[in-house]
Amino acid sequence: LEQWADWIKKFPMKDMERYGWLEPEGTKEQKLNALLNFFGVSSPDSWDAVWRATNVAYRQTRRFRTTPEAVSAWARAAELEAEQLDFEVQDFDENRLRSLLGKLRNQTTEPAERFVPTVQELCAGAGVAVVWVPELPQTGISGCARWLADNKALVALTLRYKTDDQMWLTFFHEMAHILLHKKHRCFIMDNADQDLADNVIDPQMQREEEEANRFAEDTLVPPSDLHTFIQKSSFSLESIKQFSEKLGIGPGILVGRLQREEILGYNQGNGLKRKFNWTIGEKDSAAL
């Protein structure tokens, strides 16, 4: 048991307990067993074989220090959350998922209590489980896209940065990975609009990230519509609200796009963004 004491210490146990992923345990043996049960493995060596060897494409900036233990704990929590969905996840249907992009985009106008179940139901019908999982320390994660099986996918999101423009950009970024890129890969990202030049990734990963970024940006605000709005040269809050309503998206989504296009400063228009937070329930479970 003593040989695994250092392994146990590498996991953010307090946060995992606070979110209800682990029962608070006292002894080293209890903590070890709780971790093994959580991961569904028989030993730390088995964890190493299953989780450290997972083919993870992790877009990670140098600003964030991460550990495989924390990242794997978050990824496992997303798996378990997907198993508890209220909706049965059907076999993956690319055409159906593409046909739903407009409806999913329209959910950007809704509050969390309405868009969460709607997004989950729509995506489950196309073969994608969508879950929201609190970020753990030493992960720096905004979202993840991976395949649970050949015919079922998972998209998991945190509330990193806690604004609707970032959350929805991450959502459609991860959807792009599901629709455009290889199966049997796990795409974990830190920030959907981070400059790729700051990332340590190979050329193929960079192309995939750029494709996912462009897909997300253009799905939320089509280029022709963005051009039309920019040509008007009126970027007041009222103009943004009116044009967002015309597009059928939340005004914070347009603000975020204008900021990334350097038309607005990052200190402008933020009052139009919807902000999200986690609530910790009576049983220490996290909910959006």
Where are the regions a protein language model picked out?
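Active-site hotspot residues in diverse enzymes, especially metal/ion-binding acidic/histidine motifs
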Residues: 1-288
